[in-house]
Amino acid sequence: MEVNLDLHCDLTAYLLQPYSSPNGDVRCSVDKLFAGNVKMQVMAFYSATEKGSVDEVKEQLKHYRSLLNLPGVYEFYPEKAELQEGLGIIAAVENASGLCEEDQPVEDAFKNLDWLISQAKIMYVGLTHHLENRFGGGNFTQAGLKDDGKRLIDFLD
């Protein structure tokens, strides 16, 4: 049987919806991931560039942590590069606006990222999504990398 590694899943954002369930009627449900023989799943913490984006990522982290309590779900560590039985999950920040809102000091992004890393294994941090933010331009913009984006990249390095 083939093994599938999936690098993007919106389950934690979906779980922000009222009455949602990790095994609900959604194509990214844990049940469907198991049925598709997904052995490693990146759980993208997405928030739009707007007020409340940092709190939204913190809520998604809570859902991520609760997924780890489900039978057969474990946190994946790429440095071990070893898949176990079940579903390995690892978090990612899909839009750095989830680390720091537009009107907050950029140092808040560093503090929030450090805190996230203390709570979950993070696969990657995306600076933008579709639109422009303080870190750079998304795929629907002409803006490039901005000074705060350079600072975040330096911090990640």
Positions of predicted regions on the chain:
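N-terminal hydrophobic targeting/anchoring segments and the immediately downstream early-domain regions
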Residues: M1-D147, R151
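Substrate-binding cleft of carbohydrate-active enzyme catalytic domains
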Residues: L152-D157
